[in-house]
């Protein structure tokens, strides 16, 4: 949600910002101003009618005291007319306000000026790379590697067929040592983020109500990307939703900031716009696990510094696992709707001979805070101001598993366990 006064006072700034997103939304500013004018006009009409009703109501008593029944009758007619006008104007006010709020709730955030302008991923800008991709002769992809590894009864450790029989496409069942490797990755990530990077581990709901998704910006525009369970509950597409909503409708003290949360949860996405993309393997699943990072800070300066810190925390996971990666600054047309600035981390996948996204870290400004009414007091008795929020993957566990399998594969099909994970694997150094 945006401050309508800010749009009213500087419409060109909003028009230009939405035009930079290449979303075709620049003209929406005119629609906003039109609805705003209708709402203010109706509000004024209702207030004027209320004032007329109150004034004439007082005069009725005076007319009756003077036994001027004709004047009293005239005034009562005016009061009745004012009540009708109030009802009509009130209805018009409510309708205009609802239409205005609905329009504002569906609009994306404003990109920062420093974000490069572009229409899609081709406009993203590489910031740096880390590590050298390993030279692997005839690398196999993770799906082939996982299916070739056998668990009990000779069943594949990465079993897409079993998952499909119970759930359909874009699901997987992991067995044996691959299951342990997935758990090891999640525990390693959580330990790193909590013991070294200052994040507080949380256990949060993965079923949330409409208002939680409105707060973080997935609703109303992206409902088709979500799984709905009941009339008012949805499965979370990311723990960002639950972690960010921890400060919903709260007024924090400045001394409490920054807040840093992390959680390991299953995530659920319909992948409505991904038909035909990454249909094989674990890259794009309806259900996957992720370690999420969320930060709550006071203002833009702190938010931009926190974005660098958060992205570095995510990068450290890849460094400890010795997985080559690069950091990309996303352009205006490729950023998520709630972001003002986003870095993507992309990990090297030998089978594809390219980098693939494994983490996305975003600074959202006060975009989510306004929708959640999350505020803080800069001073003990100061007027509350909106907090600023950030979120990032630290990391997507399934995609990290994919990267480990592909980058640590051996010629015989076995997988060397990264040194950082050996303690989490009970000393197991090779999966075969």
Curated annotation (Swiss-Prot):
InterPro entries: aa-tRNA-synt_IIb, aa-tRNA-synth_II, aa-tRNA-synth_II/BPL/LPL, Ser-tRNA-ligase_type_1, Ser-tRNA-synth_1_N, SerRS_1_N_sf, SerRS_core, tRNA-bd_arm. Consists of two distinct domains, a catalytic core and a N-terminal extension that is involved in tRNA binding. L-serine binds at residues 238-240, 292, 393. It is an enzyme of class 6 (ligase). Catalyzes the attachment of serine to tRNA(Ser). Is also able to aminoacylate tRNA(Sec) with serine, to form the misacylated tRNA L-seryl-tRNA(Sec), which will be further converted into selenocysteinyl-tRNA(Sec). Belongs to the class-II aminoacyl-tRNA synthetase family. Type-1 seryl-tRNA synthetase subfamily. Pathway: Aminoacyl-tRNA biosynthesis; selenocysteinyl-tRNA(Sec) biosynthesis; L-seryl-tRNA(Sec) from L-serine and tRNA(Sec): step 1/1. Disulfide bonds: none annotated. GO terms for biological process: selenocysteine biosynthetic process; seryl-tRNA aminoacylation. It comes from the Bacteria. Homodimer. The tRNA molecule binds across the dimer. Its EC number is 6.1.1.11. ATP binds at residues 269-271, 357-360. PANTHER family: SERINE--TRNA LIGASE (PTHR43697:SF1), SERYL-TRNA SYNTHETASE (PTHR43697). This is Serine--tRNA ligase. It is found in: Cytoplasm. Keywords: Aminoacyl-tRNA synthetase, ATP-binding, Cytoplasm, Ligase, Nucleotide-binding, Protein biosynthesis. It catalyses: tRNA(Ser) + L-serine + ATP = L-seryl-tRNA(Ser) + AMP + diphosphate + H(+); tRNA(Sec) + L-serine + ATP = L-seryl-tRNA(Sec) + AMP + diphosphate + H(+). Its main location: cytoplasm. One of its GO terms (molecular function) is serine-tRNA ligase activity. GO terms for cellular component: cytoplasm.
